[in-house]
UniProtKB/Swiss-Prot annotation:
Domain of life of the native organism: Eukaryota
Principal localisation: secreted
Pfam family, one: Clusterin
SMART domains: CLa, CLb
PTM comment, free text: Proteolytically cleaved on its way through the secretory system, probably within the Golgi lumen.
GO MF term set: misfolded protein binding
Induction: By different retroviral oncogenes.
GO biological process, one term: protein stabilization
Name of the protein: Clusterin
Family assignment from sequence similarity: Belongs to the clusterin family.
The keyword Chaperone belongs to this UniProt entry's keyword annotation: yes
Cited function: Functions as extracellular chaperone that prevents aggregation of nonnative proteins. Prevents stress-induced aggregation of blood plasma proteins. Does not require ATP. Maintains partially unfolded proteins in a state appropriate for subsequent refolding by other chaperones, such as HSPA8/HSC70. Does not refold proteins by itself. Binding to cell surface receptors triggers internalization of the chaperone-client complex and subsequent lysosomal or proteasomal degradation.
Length: 451
């Protein structure tokens, strides 16, 4: 601190009519008493950061177990999809069986499918009916009843959903990594205080504190973080912006997506043309029909002749085909079950991250300020320096009341700060410096914590 600045502060107080209470040689004792309080608060904050680190390490272990479960579920899902594709291919090679019966039904099924699909599209979607109608007619003309007979669009559903799950997983994984890195940064910055500033951390019971939290094997990041890291770059500059904010927008976005996704999964498109529709589902249906006319095949249950195609039994002509179809259906059901399981696991992981990030934010708001002291060097006189103690001008409305005391301090590397202590607490009362140190630290926290 520059001496001219202190002189000006002291002069300013004297000019206001204040009276010096403490001789200069006593200021060091007050500084030492205040620094003792600050040291205890810093120690408490570092222990709070330790709680953050412990929580994050525990979460990381649970995360690794979750990754293993996700990988196992994904593997089983992919095996079931692969089997379904193989059975579909084998069925396609035998589609000439019962071909005459199904072709006849197909010619009556197509007009109904087109009419039903366009009716739903016109009701849900704002524009593009003419183009969609032409695309749908071309699609139906080059398709065969086999598409309906084997429920082929269910495989398309599985493949599309797999892509969405992969994107969602990558997003979650990257955000988890950012949270993990943020906690690690706060911890590492806090541990910079060990050394000249806090030599007691080098001896029991604090000895080995830092080393105890250095993992023997660094976590392997499964997903490149470049894309999302750029989007969330401000988080690295100001980690106190909030861990919870990493996951809350993603949770809301995913909730909308899943609400629509499950609706499409559980109901045929024809079922969307009801009063229970919602706008997110409508948008999804419109987009799907515009992108892929095959989505209209879901409406087969709305058309009698299409339902009859589903009921065609070719077992008398070719028992093997009937067996293949049964195997195909079994594989599809299994793949759908594992797909739902994977979604549930991702949702559980995301909910856990919301809870953990909220708790980390609470700890960070309470203790994270200590990480701002990482590059600070403590002098021989401690972190809190008392520069002036003056009695303020008595209250004219109550002259008999003791005048408040004005104290000027400097805490850490902050600017000098003027604080007021009630007049009934004298400067030699132990509570005096506790009040001063507490006020100074509270002011520092407010200016160094980003809500």
């Amino acid at each position: 601190m520059e001496l001219p600045l202190l002189a000006l502060l002291s002069l300013g107080l004297v000019c206001q009519g204040g009276q010096g209470l403490v001789p200069p040689n006593e200021l060091k004792q007050l500084s030492a008493a205040g620094s003792k309080y600050i040291d205890a608060e810093v120690e408490n904050a570092i222990n709070g950061v330790k709680q953050m680190k412990t929580l994050m390490d525990k979460t990381s272990k649970e995360h690794q177990a979750m990754l293993h479960t996700l990988e196992e579920t994904k593997k089983k899902k992919e095996e079931a999809v692969k089997l379904a594709l193989e059975k579909e291919k084998q069925l396609a090679e035998k589609q000439e069986v019962c071909n005459e019966t199904m072709l006849s039904l197909w010619e009556e099924c197509k007009p109904c499918l087109k009419h039903t699909c366009m009716r739903v599209y016109s009701k849900m979607c704002h524009s593009g009916s003419g183009l969609v109608g032409r695309q749908l007619e071309e699609f139906l003309n080059r398709s065969s009843p086999f598409s309906i007979w084997v429920n082929g669009e269910r495989i398309d559903d599985l493949l599309d959903r797999e892509q969405r799950q992969e994107r969602r997983f990558e997003d979650l994984e990257e955000r988890f990594g950012l949270m993990e890195d943020g906690v690690e940064d706060i911890f590492q910055d806090s541990t910079q205080l060990y050394g000249p500033a806090f030599p007691f951390f080098r001896t029991p019971p604090f000895g080995g504190f830092r080393e105890a939290f250095v993992p023997p094997v660094q976590r392997v990041h499964l997903v490149p973080r470049r894309r999302l890291s750029r989007e969330l770059h401000p988080f690295f500059q100001h980690p106190m912006h909030g861990f919870h904010r990493l996951f809350q927008p993603l949770f809301e976005m995913t909730q909308h997506m899943l609400d629509g996704g499950h609706g499409a999964w559980e109901h045929p498109l024809g079922g969307f043309a009801t009063e229970s529709r919602n706008f997110s589902t409508d948008r999804m249906v419109c987009r799907e029909i515009r992108r892929n006319s095959a989505g209209c095949l879901r409406m087969r249950d709305e058309c009698e002749k299409c339902r009859e195609i589903l009921a065609v039994d070719c077992s008398q002509t070719d028992p093997v085909q009937s067996q293949l179809r049964e195997q195909f259906e079994d594989a599809l059901r299994l793949a759908e079950r594992f797909t739902r399981r994977y979604d549930d696991l991702l949702s559980a992981f995301q909910a856990e991250m919301l809870n953990t990030s909220s708790l980390l934010d609470q700890l960070n708001r309470q203790f994270g300020w200590v990480s701002r002291l990482g590059n600070l060097t403590q002098g021989n006189d401690g972190f809190l320096q008392v520069t002036t103690v003056f009695s303020k001008t008595p209250n004219l409305e109550d002259p008999s009341a003791p005048a408040d005391t004005q104290v000027t301090v400097q805490l850490f590397d902050s600017e000098p700060l003027s604080l007021t202590v009630p007049g009934d607490i004298s400067w030699d009362d132990p509570r005096f410096m506790e009040i001063v140190a507490e006020q100074a630290l509270q002011h520092y926290k407010q200016n160094n914590t980003i809500e």
